[in-house]
């Protein structure tokens, strides 16, 4: 995940 985004789930 990133600071405010979790494209993997």
From Swiss-Prot:
Disulfide bonds join 1-6. Keywords: Amidation, Disulfide bond, Hormone, Secreted. PROSITE patterns: NEUROHYPOPHYS_HORM (PS00264). The modification Glycine amide is found at residue 9. GO terms for molecular function: neurohypophyseal hormone activity. The keyword Secreted applies. InterPro entries: Neurohypophysial_hormone_CS. It is found in: Secreted. The keyword Magnesium does not apply. GO terms for cellular component: extracellular region. Belongs to the vasopressin/oxytocin family. Displays oxytocic activity on rat uterus. This is Asvatocin.
């Amino acid at each position: 995940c990133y600071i405010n985004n979790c494209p993997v789930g």
